[in-house]
Amino acid sequence: MSQGKIIKVSGPLVLASGMQEANIQDICRVGDLGLIGEIIEMRRDQASIQVYEETSGLGPGEPVITTGSPLSVELGPGLISQMFDGIQRPLERFQTITESDFLVRGVQLPNLDRETKWNFVPSLSVGDAVEAGDILGTVQETNLVEHRIMVPVGVSGRLANISAGSFTVEETVYEIEQAEGSIFKGTLMQKWPVRRGRPFAQKLIPVEPLVTGQRVIDTFFPVTKGGAAAVPGPFGAGKTVVQHQVAKFANVDIVIYVGCGERGNEMTDVLNEFPELIDPSTGQSIMQRTVLIANTSNMPVAAREASIYTGITIAEYFRDMGYSVAIMADSTSRWAEALREMSGRLEEMPGDEGYPAYLGSRIAEYYERAGRVKTLGSTAREGSITAIGAVSPPGGDISEPVTQNTLRIVKVFWGLDAQLAQRRHFPAINWLSSYSLYLDEVGAYIDQHEKIAWAEKVTKAMNILQKESELQEIVRLVGLDSLSEKDRLTMNAAKMIREDYLQQNAFDDVDTYTSFKKQVALLSNILTFDAEANRALELGAYFREIMEGTVELRDRIARSKFVHEDQLEKIQALSQTIEETLHQILAQGGLDNERH
């Protein structure tokens, strides 16, 4: 520990002298209040410190004390269903201790609760050989999450002692005799610096789809477990609702939700809604698998920059246990703005639109910590982190630096469209401008495991939507009646896909989530209708006759998405009805043809 003194305060940036013994990335206690700060630049004995708390009232001459350790998070039981700020301070306990609705400055409290006792059940015995990543035992943290206690990175040897029972996160639970003869005493908790990725044995290719229950995502633009996706869109297009929907219904074990620089009301919505929502696969409250990190727009700017790293480090910890994790960052644009602010205060050379020249590498560092991996440890385990980042480009202009740097790295682009949002089409993901580079892997995985030609159905549906886009140019110029009968059927099929399949009501109890089997049934019915209608047209029926004869049938297809998951046979039975109805129209059309 070394002590310097403040010589300059510039917003969240503090310049201190007499810091020759300090290192870059060291955590400091700044001023008489002891505010938390991190050294981000060293020049001789002067340190530039970004302070994670409000700096008003700080002045030259006040002390700066370094702790000698980097910004780290505490990893152990007590993370799940908790809400932390950007540097992992527990907000609920913070409020209880300070008796204030605001972040009181200079308060020091442990990140994980030191008083709660957790019931530890060992899975190894004394004398067993262990290495980094091995699971020593488990703690049932919530009904959904079994917290696996692992040997910390850099520790290996023989298990000299291990105890069962109830312990706090600070009490010694096991002892490992290392090769050099020293004894490592381990607790339920370990610390890890947030800016350093946790190690793993091997990176694997992600192939299994992340099922979100959102039809436009799962069908056309899927993301894999271990993939990375970006959700750019203008104000009011529905970025936060898309993130919330994925957080609620994704088929993952753990969800980390980082509210980074967005409005406080959005985190309030999460706190109000998540405890009441039931996970479709387990029947438990989804809050029992969720960690919330809140760094809203009225909190200090510098802590935004740390919040993303705090979230991804917690995600890596659960990944190492063998869990699939999804991390939502809402929004990475606000995080980039925090980088821009600090870069400006440091008087660095600006890049595009004032962002620092290293913006691209910082964004890449974050997304590259996602992925599917084979974890450390003597027993083979797989874990994954799926990173989904919202981007808020000013005015919806996706040519700005944050969006462009993000799109260079991620493989899925869910482009939100203001025009679709204005037409009340939600999720407002534009099916013509969005893309997923995981389509082939996901298609092959589904074809193999579900034994259905899913990739073929998706291609047919997308071709119909693309054909509609081409025909709309003609319709705008000369009207719908000028189209051929076949093209008018294509326009009708595209309308059915858009309104009866892609459009989804997040506030309807049934329509908010669609299982994969239901998605297959819904899309199959629309494609069957289009195929049978085209066949009837080729065999002599007229477009008008097909439309007039299928009013009730099309209404039933449209209402199918509101059928409960446990009544799927009703949707599947519609396929037979579609064929019968169009055969009847064809039979009548044959008679009509003689009259025409």
Swiss-Prot record:
Pfam families: ATP-synt_ab, ATP-synt_ab_N, ATP-synt_ab_Xtn, ATP-synt_VA_C. Gene3D superfamilies: 2.40.30.20, 2.40.50.100, Bovine Mitochondrial F1-atpase, Atp Synthase Beta Chain, Chain D, domain 3, P-loop containing nucleotide triphosphate hydrolases. GO terms for molecular function: ATP binding; proton-transporting ATP synthase activity, rotational mechanism; proton-transporting ATPase activity, rotational mechanism. Belongs to the ATPase alpha/beta chains family. Produces ATP from ADP in the presence of a proton gradient across the membrane. The V-type alpha chain is a catalytic subunit. PANTHER family: H(+)-TRANSPORTING TWO-SECTOR ATPASE, V-TYPE PROTON ATPASE CATALYTIC SUBUNIT A. This is V-type ATP synthase alpha chain.
